A protein has these predicted regions:
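Amphipathic alpha-helical polymerization modules
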Residues: 1-101
């Protein structure tokens, strides 16, 4: 695995976390809308690394504030963890470039 693929995997994780955060924010913003059905995010591991996301609509009507608050916290923590990996990969690549010069 090279530095580029590590960065790409971390970036896909950050994008997945952002999608989850957007979805839960959408759910909270629309919870008082009549007939509203929650959005749910399905994450799938990709061959070669990384993650993809799919938005679906819940079969159940109505809000689930507790679920959305937990989803927001998970998205935040996932984003921060992937950001740390991305930064570390960037620092390692920079150190390798300095050695080659």
């Amino acid at each position: 695995m090279n530095m580029t693929s590590i960065s790409s995997i971390a970036l896909s994780g950050m994008n997945a976390a952002q999608t989850s955060l957007n979805s839960s924010a959408h759910n909270v913003a629309n919870m008082n809308t009549s007939g509203f059905r929650r959005q749910e995010v399905i994450q799938n591991a990709q061959i070669g690394g990384g993650v993809s996301t799919t938005l679906t609509t819940s079969s159940e009507q109505g809000p689930s504030v507790a679920t959305d608050v937990v989803a927001q916290l998970q998205a935040k923590n996932s984003f921060l963890a992937n950001l740390a990996v991305f930064k570390t990969s960037d620092q390692m690549a920079g150190a390798l470039l300095n050695l080659k010069v």
